[in-house]
Amino acid sequence: MSYLLYAVWEHNYDMTKFLLENGADPNFVSVFWDETPEETVCMLPLERTCYDKYGMNYMKLLLEHGANPNDTRAQLPLFAAALYKDKQKIEYLLEHGADINQFDSVKETVIIDQALARQWDLVLWLWDKGADPMKTGGIGRNTGGKENVAYWVQDFINYGNGDYDNPDFKKLVARLKSIGVEFPYKPAMDNTEENE
């Protein structure tokens, strides 16, 4: 773990600022492991600051010193902020160059990730912010690279025991239909049949 990431990790703002002012690279990837060396995790300081226990000041400081909000060598900062539904951090990242439609290392976008997590309210909000619900990707879940928001909506419907009366879910389905998506959504149905 880099000194910079460690300073962020320990919530030491003064040291974070000192290191950046003295040449620390905000885009240096740290590789570390929790329990065994076989389970490594890559992390960038900007990603860490997007988790819920950090104020905006850390993120602002890193971006002021050249942190790249679209660096895919670790989890994208947008994904970390979305995990905690931190709309303020998401908006700030977008204002400072984050690409809302950037694929991560497994070819998912933040809106695909939130659809997978069934966070329908955040999916709608991200769509309003410019996320493309039909951008298709995904390589990590046996989906054949067919993942998009419609795919995960159909998956939710196929599951058979969700809250289909959720107002945000209903809005999302209606909005997808308004752009020409038909349910049942064929790519998700095809994949279900292939896996049976």
Predicted segments with their positions:
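A short, hydrophobic/aromatic-rich structural module that often spans a beta strand
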Residues: 68-95, 101, 105, 116-117, ...
